[in-house]
Amino acid sequence: MRLCLIPQNTGTPQRVLPPVVWSPPSRKKPMLSACNSMMFGHLSPVRIPHLRGKFNLQLPSLDEQVIPARLPKMEVRAEEPKEATEVKDQVETQGQEDNKRGPCSNGEAASTSSLLETQGNLTSSWYNPRPLEGNVHLKSLIEKNQTDKAQVHAVSFYSKDHEVASSHSPAGGILSFGKPDPLPTVLPAPVPGCSLWPEKAALKVLGKDHLPSSPGLLMVGEDMQPKDPAALGSSRSSPSRAASHSSHKRKLSEPPLQLQPTPPLQLKWDRDEGPPPAKFPCLSPEALLVSQASQREGRLQQGNMCKNMRVLSRTSKFRRLRELLRRRKKRRQGRCGSSHL
């Protein structure tokens, strides 16, 4: 008899052990409870119904998703350069000096005004930077500074260079634009921070009739232009390239050397026949006999030398064998004599 413990979970509160009942084991099959049926029992297949309805997904359009981006506002402050103030001071001092000297003629004034206007337009077009997208006030300030610079530069250039005082000039020591300078003088250095490209452009636009005829003034733009090192290197290397190109052209222009055709071989015999036998030097019969005899003697001597070597080798071998045999006999005789004694 076996006693099994069967717990009774019905009606027991939590944290309290159920009472133990001792009873004999039953032969009946254990019954599956509702809790254990999911673990030990067979699972029935679950059927999922098919979806019969249709769903329409509404996606937002691309135009609605576009978000306008705001550009940041850029504030640029333009500072007046120090060069403008310095140039203004120079212009004022030069204007006072011109007033002291005296007024010029109407023709000279008209020519100078036209030249200054063209020069100012050229310099303003040359110094005009890229347009800035910003305040209108900033653009106006930049344009004013540029025009002031251009006018000041033109006035300083023509007041210093075109009105050169000399003792040979007839009217008050000032040369007009139409008359040539008898003694060309050294021109002063240009204003710092300004290039001479506008002067060159003015020379091309106005022509030779409206400009002074002095050679020194005409050569200012070409002499005072800044030369780049790359341009200098190319100018130095250009003569060598030109020389090599000309030599290459000469080589190409020369006609190619024509190879002369080689004459065909002139055979002294027919093609079917072979070449004639080689010619030996003519010798007398006595000389032939002597040469043959010398050859025979040489052969005999060589043969005799070989025979002698063979004989010597054989004789040396025989002599060695004889000596060995004699030594053995002596040893045997000595042993036999000692045994008899």
Curated annotation (Swiss-Prot):
Residues 75-101 have a biased composition (Basic and acidic residues). It holds the Pfam family POM121. Residues 75-115, 216-278 are annotated as: Disordered. Residues 234-245 have a biased composition (Low complexity). Belongs to the UPF0607 family. This is Putative UPF0607 protein ENSP00000383783. It comes from Homo sapiens.
